[in-house]
Swiss-Prot record:
Species for this entry: Caenorhabditis briggsae
Keyword Lipoprotein tagged: yes
Protein name: Trafficking protein particle complex subunit 3 homolog
GO CC annotation terms, alphabetical: cis-Golgi network membrane; cytosol; endoplasmic reticulum; TRAPP complex
InterPro entries hit by this protein: Bet3 (IPR016721), NO_sig/Golgi_transp_ligand-bd (IPR024096), TRAPP_component (IPR007194)
Domain of life assignment: Eukaryota
Keyword DNA-binding listed: no
Lipidation (S-palmitoyl cysteine): 70
Keywords from the named record: Endoplasmic reticulum, ER-Golgi transport, Golgi apparatus, Lipoprotein, Palmitate, Transport
Protein location: Golgi apparatus, cis-Golgi network; Endoplasmic reticulum
A biological process term (GO) from this entry: intra-Golgi vesicle-mediated transport
Record note on quaternary structure: Homodimer. Part of the multisubunit TRAPP (transport protein particle) complex.
Function recorded in the entry: May play a role in vesicular transport from endoplasmic reticulum to Golgi. Required for the systemic spread of the RNAi response.
Protein family: Belongs to the TRAPP small subunits family. BET3 subfamily.
Length: 181
């Protein structure tokens, strides 16, 4: 493949990322008009992210067959920071601030593609808007798809975005009502 073609592919990916950021900002703006309460918008962003995450888990596992089965939260954090977040967001992430016996940690995104082209008004943040909650919801959905129930919340602080993740339980497979083993 020639350098020109590779450069055009890289540029098209960058353009689609910028388009996504602008579209996301417009969507959040419309949601703020529709719901009026920024806390309700945060809840809706979380739900949307959760639905995306359940589908991204299948895509991630299909593309990354060499990822080992995670048995603890440190392994989950490692796979999220080294594989999943760079793959889908194109940014690096680190896990830190372990607490509650390794059941709670914070993932820090050094640059958040959702916030590159926007400035969220401080009054909306103080009223309960978590602009990047869709990312936290996607992580929650992806982990639930692989049978880990977690709570996730996002907070944008200047240049970084912090996603607090708290492990709740390992979910058991269950058959639909009326079906036997």
């Amino acid at each position: 493949m020639s350098k020109a073609i590779k450069q055009n592919l890289a540029d098209s990916k960058k353009m689609s990322a910028e388009l996504f950021c602008l579209t996301y900002g417009a969507m959040v703006t419309e949601m703020l008009k529709d719901y009026e309460d920024p806390k309700d918008v945060t809840v809706q962003l979380d739900k949307m992210g959760f639905n995306m995450g359940t589908r991204l888990a299948d895509d991630f596992l299909a593309k990354n067959a060499n990822v080992p089965r995670c048995v603890d939260t440190r392994q989950i954090a490692d796979v999220l920071c080294r594989n999943a977040i760079p793959c889908y967001l194109g940014v690096s992430a680190t896990a830190s601030s372990w607490s509650s016996g390794d059941r709670e940690f914070i993932i820090t995104l050094e640059s958040n593609p959702l916030t590159e082209l926007v400035q969220v008004p401080p009054n909306l943040v103080s009223a309960g808007l978590s602009y990047s909650q869709m990312i936290a919801g996607a992580i929650r959905g992806a982990l639930e798809a692989v049978h880990f129930k977690v709570y996730a919340s996002a907070a944008d602080s200047g240049a970084n975005t912090e996603i607090r993740i708290r492990f709740d339980q390992v979910l058991k497979d269950s058959l639909p009502a009326g079906e036997d083993d």
